[in-house]
UniProtKB/Swiss-Prot annotation:
One of its GO terms (molecular function) is ATP binding. The gene is serS. Belongs to the class-II aminoacyl-tRNA synthetase family. Type-1 seryl-tRNA synthetase subfamily. This is Serine--tRNA ligase. Its main location: cytoplasm.
Amino acid sequence: MLDQKLIRENPTFVENNLSLRGKFYDIHSIHKITVERKEIDIKISSLQSESKKLSKIIGQEIRNPNNANSQELNKLKEQGNKYRIKVSEFEEKKRILDQQIRDEILKLPNFPSKDAPFGENESNNIQIKEWGDPLKKDNLKTHWEIGENLKLFDSIKSTKIAKSRFITLSGNGARLERALINFMLDVHSNNGYLELMPPALVNSESLQGSGQLPKFSNESFKCANDDLWLSPTAEVPLTAFHKNEIIDPKLLPLKYVAYSPCFRREAGSYGRDTKGLIRLHQFNKVELYWFSDPNKSLEAHKEITADAESILKKLNLPYRLVDICTGDLGFSSSRTFDLEVWLPSNKCYREISSCSNCRDFQARRSSIRTKIDKKTSYIHTLNGSGLAIGRTMAAILENGQRPDGSVKIPDVLVPYFGSSLIKTN
C-alpha cells in the first residue's frame, strides 16, 4: 500500500511514479478525499479544544453554589452537548472517508523501482544472462506427449473429477513431483530457510495484505459460506504470518520456505497452454519469502534470486535471467527478476520463477514493522518461487528426453526419485 501522507502532500509525484507502469492512475481524486479528511480532523480538534475550555467553565460554575441551577449554566451544558454531537458527526464522516481512502489506495499498485528498466510490456524486458546449453533439435516431443507415453499423468480423468485444466499425477509422475518437492525443500532449508507449512485456505485480509485483493478477486476461488479463499500462492499466508507485528531487527532477515498447493482461475488465459503442466487451476509450488531490513532489501533481492537459480543449476536445466520492465511488473512488486527455463519443444524460455522485491508495499497493507535507529519503520518483503513444481517437471521431461522414449532424471534428483531413468513399460 502506498503512503497516504505522500498522496496527500505530493499527489503529482505519486501519479508520475505510477505512470511508469504505462497506465494512468487518478491520484488527484484520492488527494481530494485526503484533503477533506484532513480538514475534518482540524474541525474535530477545534471542537474538542472548545469543548475542553467549556468543560472548565462549567466546572467552575458548578462549584459556585449560587449558579448550580442557573439558566446560564444550563445554556453552557447545552452548548457542550452540541459540541459532543458535532464531534460525533464529524467522527462518523471521518470514518467513512477513511474507508473510502483505504479502498482507493488498496487499488493502487506499487511504485516501480528506479532501477527497473522502463517499458510498456514484456517485449521491453531485458535479458541479464543465459545459463546452460539449451537443447535445440527438431521433432522433439512436448512434455505432455512424453507424460502420456510414460503414463505419468492423466488430464482426461481429471476433467471427470473436476473440470479442464486439472491433472492427476500417477506412478512415476506422482513420484517425480514428490521428489522435486522434497529436493527443493532440503536445498533451501540447508541454505538457512525455515520451513513452514501454512494453511491452504486464507481469509480476505490476508489476500488484501499481499496485494491479491481487491484487484485479483476474479482470479481466485472463494468459499461460498466463509470468508475464506483457496490460496493462489504461499506468498499470501507467508506475508500474513507476521501481520500486525513489530519484528525485532536482530532477527532480520527472516527467511522462510514453504511448499503449498496453489489454486488459480487463470481467467485471462483462455485458449493458452491448454495441455500439460504449464497452466493449471491447481499446482504445487515451493515458495521463498524474506522479511528484510529496509536498508538491505536490494542485496536481499539478489540473494533470493540466486537461491531460486541454484535449483535450476543443480537440476542442470538451461535458463535465462530477465529484468522485468516497469510496464510488466506485478501489482505488489517494485522490481522483479524472472527465471525462465528452456522448453525445447517450444524452442523458447518459459517463466518458472518470479523473484520480487516488494519493499514496504505489503508491509504497509499488513502492518508489519521493525525498529530502525530506535524508530518504527515498515519492513521490506521479498518473494520468489523456488520453484514451480509442474513447470520444473515439464522442463525435466523435455530436456531429459531420449530417442528410445525414456527420460533421464537429473543426478541430484536420483536419491529422491530412486532411479536415473523413467522408462516405458
